[in-house]
Each structure stands twice: as C-alpha cells, then as structure tokens.
Design a protein with these regions (language model features):
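Short glycine/serine-rich loop segments
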Residues: 1-113, 309-329
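A short helix-breaking turn/cap at a secondary-structure junction
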Residues: 69-164, 170, 353-363
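Short helix-loop capping/hinge segments that flank enzyme active sites or metal/cofactor-binding pockets
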Residues: 135-144, 193-255, 269-280, 318-319, ...
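Acyltransferase
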Residues: 152-179, 204-215, 240-261
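Short, gly/Ser/Thr-rich active-site loops of penicillin-recognizing serine hydrolases
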Residues: 238, 342-363
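Short, surface-exposed loop/helix-turn segments at secondary-structure junctions
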Residues: 242, 274-301
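Small-aliphatic-rich amphipathic alpha-helix that forms the alpha element of a beta-alpha
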Residues: 256, 293-317
C-alpha cells in the first residue's frame, strides 16, 4: 500500500517499492498495488482494496487483473485509514471493493461485501439487482476511448480501439459517439474540488493553515495545478456545497445516459504501467503521455474520476496487452447501484478480448 493510500504507485518506508509483475521497472499502480500484484502472481484467491481516485482500478489495469469500485456507500468503510485512526465518518468519494482474477469472483465478492454496517443494518437491507442483459449482443454499450483533456497513450489507445472492433465482431452494439452530456475536463475539475475539499478535515491543523495562507496569497490569474490544489483544499463550506450540488447534476446526466445505454467503456487510466517515480513532491511530478508531460494527479485522474465523482460502479477488466507487452485494462462504468451489470459487462468484454493471464516466471 502506498503511504496513507495516497498515490497511484505503491511504495512506503516500511516495505519499500512494489514492482509490476509484468515488468519490474514499472509501477504496480496504487494505492492498492500490493493487492493487485498478489492476485496477478497467484498469491491469493481474493483481495480487497479501497478506491477514491482509482486505487482499485488503476493497479488492477496495470497488473492484468479485475478490480471493482462499488457504487458509493454500499460497502461499509468505517475504520478505513485515511482518515486518521478512530474516524467514524465515511470519507466522501471513498469506496472499498474486491480485486480478483475473474469477473465471477468479483460478483461473488460483492454479494458478500455489499450491505449496511451494524449501525445501519437495524433498518435496511441491500439487494443488488441482477445484470440488465444476458448476452453481449443484448447490451447497448457506449464507448469513450480518448479525449484531449486526458490524452490516452498511443499504445493503449490502439489496443482499446481494437477491443471495440472485437466486441462489434462478436455482436455487441457499441456507440463511440455517446457521451453523458459533460466534458471530461469539467468532470475532472469538479472531481478535484470535491476530492480535496473532502480531504481537508483530515489534515493536521498546522498543515491546513499553511495551505490556506498559500491559497489566499495566490494571484487570481494563477491556474496552475499547485494553485488549484491549494484553493480546493482551502475552499469554504459554501464552495464545497456548491461543488456537491454540481455533482448531483452530473449524476442526473449519467442517469439519462443509462436510459439509452447499459454501460460505458473507457480507459481506467490513460497509460499502461509507467516507470517508478518516488520523487516526494506530487505537485511537481509529471507523466509523459505521447511525449507530452501531464500533471501527475491532475488530468491523469480524468478517467477514473468519470465513475468516482458520481458514485457509480466502475469495473476494471484485462483486455490483452499493448504492443510493448504491458497489460491493457478497460473500465466499465455502470448505472448507480447496478454493480452486477458493470461486472457482467466486464466479464463479457474480457471473454472476447482478454482475461487474466499469469505473468511469466510466476509458478
């Protein structure tokens, strides 16, 4: 696990760096990278992770396994760290879910995990509805494979575009023009506002005061990633509530899309596994995508934020390999509370285009 579950790589001072099982020079992803590697290497029958900004879906995609971010609120997260030990309130955006070598195992795990905790179980029960359809040819699928706001690595895009054609050849209906009515850039920006606004309460008082002073001193024209991070962390309660209202409108746009389509296919992350980067300042990190540097925790999170912001289920599925031999993952975004539909579509997609493959050298 990365320190405080706060990175899209996995390393910490106690246990060192977690390598990708397909290429030790590459990251396993994060923050639940150890769980994804354990599944990929066959060390475990089932793993759990948590996912706020992709921490299940990113390592699952990088390591060639299945991972599911549940609909927000259906798997209890009481006791999760962060927040600080002893925190009772569930963090906004945070979910806990399974990582497995098959979609069937994800479905089984969700039947066991989903439901209220002891405090809420006195009054309600949860029964997830079955998948919307039975076979691939019955599903109506939307696909959003690339976007200028979060460019996708050419080798990964090439593989995902091939997956779309493989699905069509297998009888699936896939619409590559369908969108939920907002831009990826706007969604990513709103995600960051909600994310850093919700995390502010968990910061030590001194650190928060420094960030608030830094935000107040920023010139109005500074729209850099570091400036946005400071403003979002120091935002007022009113601004945070406005962001939450904007999120509700975003959810309504998704709900309308899912009256016409059963699920949306998109990248779980815009690149396959990338080289280790342990540099301490996240705000100064950049990841090259097609030769152009992208902010490490900015636009790169646009794809995991698609489901994450709006409380939707998102399932990462392995769909073969890039031309460089790295696992390629696709994300299936499903309707709210229809987790079994997202998982079922992931199973059908992987059956056609990939599925789990044991890494070389793993006995």
């Amino acid at each position: 696990l990365s320190t405080q579950a706060m990175d899209i790589q996995t390393y910490n001072a106690a246990f060192g760096t977690t390598n990708n099982p397909w290429d030790a020079t590459k990251t396993a992803g994060g923050s639940s990278g150890g769980s994804a590697v354990a599944m990929s290497a066959g060390l475990s029958a089932l793993e759990a992770g948590s996912d706020l900004g992709g921490s299940i879906r990113i390592p699952s995609s990088f390591c060639g396994v299945f991972g599911h971010r549940p609909s927000f609120g259906i798997v209890p997260t009481r006791g999760h760290v962060p927040g600080p030990p002893g925190t009772l309130a569930a963090p906004d955006l945070e979910t806990a879910g399974p990582i497995a070598r098959s979609a069937d195992d994800l479905d089984l795990a969700m039947r066991l995990l989903a439901g209220p905790d002891d405090a809420h179980g006195v009054a309600w029960r949860l029964v997830l509805p079955p998948p919307r359809r039975k076979g691939l040819s019955e599903y109506r699928l939307a696909a959003w494979i690339d976007d200028p706001a979060a460019p996708v690595d050419a080798a990964l895009r090439e593989r995902l575009e091939a997956v779309i054609e493989e699905l069509r050849a297998a009888g699936a209906e896939v619409d590559t023009e369908a969108r939920p009515g907002f831009t990826l850039a706007d969604n990513a920006r709103l995600f960051m506002r909600v994310l850093y606004g919700s995390m502010a309460a968990g910061l030590p008082e001194g650190q928060f005061e420094k960030i608030r002073a830094r935000a107040a001193a920023l010139p109005p024209e500074d729209d850099s990633f570091r400036a946005r991070l400071a403003r979002d962390t120091a935002q007022t309660h009113r601004d945070f509530d406005l962001a939450r209202e904007a999120r509700e409108r975003r959810r309504a746009q998704w709900a309308e899309l899912f009256t016409r389509y059963d699920a949306l296919l998109c990248p779980a992350f815009p690149t396959p596994a990338f080289p280790h980067d342990p540099s301490p300042d996240f705000a100064r990190r950049a990841l090259a995508v097609n030769g152009e540097p992208q902010p490490y925790l900015g636009t790169l999170l646009g794809w995991p934020a698609l489901s994450g912001l709006s409380s939707l289920p998102g399932t990462a599925a392995p769909v073969g390999f890039t031309r460089d031999g790295l696992p390629a993952g696709i994300q299936v975004v499903g309707p709210f509370l229809e987790d079994r539909t997202a998982i079922h579509v992931a199973k059908l997609v992987a059956d056609v285009s990939g599925g789990y493959v044991r890494p070389p050298g793993v006995d």
